[in-house]
Protein backbone atom coordinates (compact mmCIF):
# COMPACT_ATOMS: atom_id res chain seq x y z
CA UNK A 1 0.00 0.00 0.00
CA UNK A 2 1.18 3.49 -0.85
CA UNK A 3 2.39 5.77 1.92
CA UNK A 4 1.09 9.28 1.54
CA UNK A 5 3.16 11.28 4.02
CA UNK A 6 0.68 13.45 5.82
CA UNK A 7 -1.45 14.33 2.77
CA UNK A 8 -4.24 11.83 3.49
CA UNK A 9 -7.56 13.31 4.54
CA UNK A 10 -8.75 9.93 5.66
CA UNK A 11 -9.96 10.35 9.23
CA UNK A 12 -9.85 7.52 11.70
CA UNK A 13 -11.07 6.63 15.17
CA UNK A 14 -9.63 3.70 17.08
CA UNK A 15 -11.50 2.99 20.28
CA UNK A 16 -12.32 0.46 22.95
CA UNK A 17 -15.69 0.21 24.67
CA UNK A 18 -15.84 -0.91 28.30
CA UNK A 19 -19.28 -1.85 29.69
CA UNK A 20 -19.03 -2.41 33.45
CA UNK A 21 -21.26 -5.49 33.49
CA UNK A 22 -20.92 -9.26 33.31
CA UNK A 23 -22.91 -9.03 30.08
CA UNK A 24 -20.32 -6.76 28.47
CA UNK A 25 -20.11 -8.79 25.25
CA UNK A 26 -23.76 -8.26 24.38
CA UNK A 27 -23.56 -4.52 25.14
CA UNK A 28 -20.59 -4.11 22.80
CA UNK A 29 -22.03 -6.29 20.04
CA UNK A 30 -25.42 -4.63 20.26
CA UNK A 31 -23.96 -1.11 19.99
CA UNK A 32 -21.92 -2.11 16.95
CA UNK A 33 -24.82 -3.95 15.31
CA UNK A 34 -27.28 -1.07 15.79
CA UNK A 35 -24.84 1.39 14.21
CA UNK A 36 -24.88 1.80 10.43
CA UNK A 37 -21.24 1.53 9.38
CA UNK A 38 -21.92 1.43 5.63
CA UNK A 39 -20.15 4.78 5.15
CA UNK A 40 -16.93 3.83 6.98
CA UNK A 41 -14.37 1.05 6.85
CA UNK A 42 -14.39 -0.77 10.15
CA UNK A 43 -12.61 -3.65 11.79
CA UNK A 44 -12.83 -5.06 15.30
CA UNK A 45 -10.06 -7.16 16.81
CA UNK A 46 -9.40 -8.52 20.30
CA UNK A 47 -8.29 -5.11 21.59
CA UNK A 48 -10.19 -2.37 19.79
CA UNK A 49 -12.32 -1.25 16.86
CA UNK A 50 -11.26 1.16 14.12
CA UNK A 51 -13.45 3.37 11.92
CA UNK A 52 -11.96 4.97 8.79
CA UNK A 53 -13.52 7.37 6.30
CA UNK A 54 -14.51 11.02 6.00
CA UNK A 55 -14.73 13.19 9.11
CA UNK A 56 -18.52 13.37 8.73
CA UNK A 57 -19.03 9.64 8.70
CA UNK A 58 -16.41 8.74 11.30
CA UNK A 59 -17.96 11.09 13.87
CA UNK A 60 -21.46 9.96 12.90
CA UNK A 61 -20.60 6.32 13.57
CA UNK A 62 -18.61 7.08 16.73
CA UNK A 63 -21.48 9.04 18.28
CA UNK A 64 -24.00 6.36 17.36
CA UNK A 65 -21.93 3.59 18.93
CA UNK A 66 -21.56 5.62 22.13
CA UNK A 67 -25.28 6.43 22.30
CA UNK A 68 -26.37 2.85 21.69
CA UNK A 69 -23.97 1.57 24.35
CA UNK A 70 -24.99 4.25 26.85
CA UNK A 71 -28.67 3.45 26.32
CA UNK A 72 -28.04 -0.05 27.62
CA UNK A 73 -28.24 1.79 30.97
CA UNK A 74 -25.04 0.04 32.04
CA UNK A 75 -22.01 2.01 33.14
CA UNK A 76 -19.90 2.29 29.99
CA UNK A 77 -16.62 3.97 29.07
CA UNK A 78 -15.41 4.75 25.56
CA UNK A 79 -11.70 5.43 25.22
CA UNK A 80 -10.20 6.23 21.84
CA UNK A 81 -8.11 8.32 19.48
CA UNK A 82 -9.21 10.32 16.46
CA UNK A 83 -6.52 10.94 13.85
CA UNK A 84 -6.06 12.51 10.43
CA UNK A 85 -3.03 13.12 8.22
CA UNK A 86 -0.73 10.55 9.81
CA UNK A 87 2.52 10.34 7.79
CA UNK A 88 2.55 6.58 8.23
CA UNK A 89 -1.02 6.14 7.01
CA UNK A 90 -1.97 4.42 3.75
CA UNK A 91 -4.80 4.73 1.26
CA UNK A 92 -5.92 1.17 1.93
CA UNK A 93 -8.55 0.03 4.41
CA UNK A 94 -10.88 2.95 3.93
CA UNK A 95 -14.19 4.00 2.45
CA UNK A 96 -14.60 7.63 1.42
CA UNK A 97 -18.27 7.96 0.55
CA UNK A 98 -19.21 10.65 -1.95
CA UNK A 99 -22.40 11.41 -0.07
CA UNK A 100 -22.33 13.54 3.08
CA UNK A 101 -25.59 12.26 4.60
CA UNK A 102 -25.00 11.04 8.13
CA UNK A 103 -26.60 7.64 7.99
CA UNK A 104 -27.05 7.29 11.77
CA UNK A 105 -28.38 10.75 12.56
CA UNK A 106 -32.09 9.99 12.13
CA UNK A 107 -31.84 6.81 14.20
CA UNK A 108 -30.00 8.37 17.15
CA UNK A 109 -31.53 11.84 17.22
CA UNK A 110 -34.01 10.76 19.87
CA UNK A 111 -31.45 8.93 22.02
CA UNK A 112 -30.19 10.78 25.06
CA UNK A 113 -27.13 10.08 27.17
CA UNK A 114 -24.76 12.04 29.32
CA UNK A 115 -21.23 12.31 28.01
CA UNK A 116 -18.75 13.63 30.56
CA UNK A 117 -15.51 13.63 28.64
CA UNK A 118 -11.82 14.33 28.95
CA UNK A 119 -10.07 15.07 25.66
CA UNK A 120 -6.61 16.12 24.59
CA UNK A 121 -5.69 17.66 21.23
CA UNK A 122 -2.27 16.99 19.71
CA UNK A 123 -1.39 19.11 16.65
CA UNK A 124 1.66 17.17 15.48
CA UNK A 125 4.78 19.04 14.31
CA UNK A 126 2.98 22.34 14.85
CA UNK A 127 5.11 25.13 16.41
CA UNK A 128 2.00 27.00 17.60
CA UNK A 129 0.36 23.93 19.11
CA UNK A 130 -0.69 25.81 22.24
CA UNK A 131 -2.52 28.34 20.09
CA UNK A 132 -4.59 25.56 18.53
CA UNK A 133 -5.27 24.00 21.93
CA UNK A 134 -6.53 27.36 23.22
CA UNK A 135 -8.76 27.66 20.14
CA UNK A 136 -10.14 24.23 21.04
CA UNK A 137 -10.95 25.43 24.55
CA UNK A 138 -12.65 28.54 23.14
CA UNK A 139 -14.82 26.36 20.88
CA UNK A 140 -15.90 24.24 23.84
CA UNK A 141 -16.66 27.34 25.91
CA UNK A 142 -18.72 28.84 23.08
CA UNK A 143 -20.71 25.61 22.75
CA UNK A 144 -21.33 25.41 26.49
CA UNK A 145 -19.62 22.06 27.03
CA UNK A 146 -16.34 23.18 28.64
CA UNK A 147 -15.96 22.40 32.34
CA UNK A 148 -12.32 22.88 33.21
CA UNK A 149 -8.75 22.08 32.37
CA UNK A 150 -7.40 18.99 34.13
CA UNK A 151 -3.97 17.40 34.12
CA UNK A 152 -3.14 16.37 30.53
CA UNK A 153 -6.66 17.04 29.22
CA UNK A 154 -9.67 19.35 29.04
CA UNK A 155 -12.96 18.30 30.61
CA UNK A 156 -16.29 18.58 28.82
CA UNK A 157 -19.79 17.72 29.97
CA UNK A 158 -23.29 17.68 28.59
CA UNK A 159 -25.58 15.65 26.40
CA UNK A 160 -23.76 13.26 24.06
CA UNK A 161 -24.99 15.10 20.96
CA UNK A 162 -23.51 18.37 22.24
CA UNK A 163 -20.23 16.84 23.41
CA UNK A 164 -19.64 15.02 20.12
CA UNK A 165 -20.49 18.24 18.27
CA UNK A 166 -17.76 20.01 20.25
CA UNK A 167 -15.25 17.24 19.63
CA UNK A 168 -15.93 17.32 15.90
CA UNK A 169 -15.72 21.13 15.75
CA UNK A 170 -12.36 21.04 17.55
CA UNK A 171 -11.06 18.31 15.24
CA UNK A 172 -12.15 20.20 12.11
CA UNK A 173 -10.64 23.46 13.32
CA UNK A 174 -7.30 21.82 14.01
CA UNK A 175 -7.10 19.72 10.83
CA UNK A 176 -7.70 22.84 8.73
CA UNK A 177 -4.63 24.48 10.24
CA UNK A 178 -2.07 21.68 10.42
CA UNK A 179 -1.46 18.42 8.56
CA UNK A 180 -1.42 15.76 11.28
CA UNK A 181 -3.84 15.82 14.19
CA UNK A 182 -4.54 13.29 16.89
CA UNK A 183 -7.16 13.77 19.57
CA UNK A 184 -7.69 11.42 22.50
CA UNK A 185 -11.10 11.10 24.13
CA UNK A 186 -12.37 9.37 27.25
CA UNK A 187 -16.16 9.38 27.73
CA UNK A 188 -18.35 7.82 30.40
CA UNK A 189 -22.08 7.22 30.85
CA UNK A 190 -24.19 5.93 33.74
CA UNK A 191 -21.36 6.02 36.26
CA UNK A 192 -22.58 5.06 39.76
CA UNK A 193 -20.14 7.47 41.40
CA UNK A 194 -21.50 10.33 39.30
CA UNK A 195 -25.08 9.42 40.20
CA UNK A 196 -24.19 9.29 43.88
CA UNK A 197 -22.47 12.67 43.67
CA UNK A 198 -25.56 14.23 42.06
CA UNK A 199 -27.87 12.69 44.67
CA UNK A 200 -25.63 13.81 47.51
UniProtKB/Swiss-Prot annotation:
One matching Pfam family: Ykof
Stated name of the protein: Putative HMP/thiamine-binding protein YkoF
Keywords from the UniProt entry: Transport
Function: Part of the ABC transporter complex YkoCDEF that could transport hydroxymethylpyrimidine (HMP) and/or thiamine. Could also transport other HMP-containing products. Binds thiamine via its HMP moiety.
Keyword Ligase: no
Subunit structure, interactors included: Homodimer in vitro. In vivo, may be a part of an ABC transporter complex which is composed of two ATP-binding proteins (YkoD), two transmembrane proteins (YkoC and YkoE) and a solute-binding protein (YkoF).
Molecular function GO terms recorded: thiamine binding
Keyword Manganese: no
Amino acids binding thiamine: 17, 49
Transmembrane residue ranges: none
Amino acid sequence: MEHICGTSRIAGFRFSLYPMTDDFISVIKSALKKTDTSKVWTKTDHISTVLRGSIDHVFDAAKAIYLHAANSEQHIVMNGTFSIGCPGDTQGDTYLSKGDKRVNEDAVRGLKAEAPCQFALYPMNEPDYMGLIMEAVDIAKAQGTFVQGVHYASELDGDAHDVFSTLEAVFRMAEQQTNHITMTVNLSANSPSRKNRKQG
